[in-house]
């Protein structure tokens, strides 16, 4: 057991280290001719920002008086301002709109790398596609001060994910537009760690739940199991083998409009799950005649379709 704990600590330390990189040379330390001057000096020209900075979470670095100059207030992000103040113009200061995106990420991670939720940010699909901190966060003028988002979370995500926005307008959907859920209830925008299930098909930013399971389990805990009689697609392929995650034209957000057509994707005559083994046949006198509407709603009898503790065939 001790060895297992040691391994976990080692992996966590390695993961956090992976999120960190040495600061670029121009962000490292103040030189003799470019010293830290303190945030009070910034007020002389940037009062439109500093007057409300007390509401900003970054103001804690000033109030605590415990941080080093390179991690305090304005200069914690924009670098030493000595030369900038002397020149009186926009030179010799780190202006985020004009620096490379990799440098933006490096700057923010000087402070924001010590949590597991951001440990995989360099490999996240956002970073890989050129989306960095300032694309989503507005440090000086955020309408959502808690996370300094540039817009409300839903509208921010919809700015890029227009196809998902359309899905949330379908008849059967998760109620994100109504305010009952947020995108981050299921996704980690900073990059989650790929769960062990369906490694090749799940997006990296889907946050897994509990014991390395799908995020759906956070709300649908009754479907989690373990069950005495597991339904293989639920345990192996996951929820998306039958459901779509955002919205659908089909009841219960199913992938197909008619239940039996979805079931026949697996119970179709191949292997041990075939029509012969299950009694599902197309002949008129077979136990399950798919031409008869009576047998086209499989869940009418196989009620415990996510798994059962009582019946091998998921009957009530």
Language model segments and positions:
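Bacterial N-terminal signal peptides
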Residues: 4-14
